[in-house]
Amino acid sequence: MTRIVVTAEIRPSEDEDKVKVAVANFFSFKSSKVEEGKYRLFVAESDTLSSLSKFHRVLREERILDAARKYLRRGIEGDRLTFMIHKQAAYVGKITFVDSENESPLGPITYTVFHRDLEAVVDWLAPRTSRGRPLWDNPMPED
């Protein structure tokens, strides 16, 4: 079973709609909500890998498959893949991976992907390359 949860803090100085745009630039969610707490938290969810198709496309457009593959593989832990991207870069349509929450001044966008075969998910999103070109294009794994 596939489940994808994407979260982003909405800081007091931020426009909620801009945070939603930053998330939606790379993630086609089926449902969303705003949770109240220390910071307001935008939570978007989906139950299909196709919701990451925009992310898949932009990794190729930006030619960052090698870096993305290394970063994504580091985020696999059991049946969960977790990674973060810079929220302000995402708002303008760019993918910039971050290692800690401090690297994105307004907080990162955090992706958590649950899937039975996360290696296949990484192979689909960011396949191995040679001289910057994908060695293959894997089909999207089944949900």
From Swiss-Prot:
Going by the entry's taxonomy, the superkingdom of the source organism is recorded as Archaea
Q: Which Pfam families match?
A: RNA_binding
Q: Could you tell me which InterPro entries the record lists for this protein? A: PAB1135-like, Ribosomal_uL5_dom_sf
Record Gene3D superfamilies: 3.30.1440.10
Protein's name according to its UniProt entry: UPF0201 protein Msed_1787
This protein's species is Metallosphaera sedula (strain ATCC 51363 / DSM 5348 / JCM 9185 / NBRC 15509 / TH2)
Q: Which family does the record claim for this protein?
A: Belongs to the UPF0201 family.
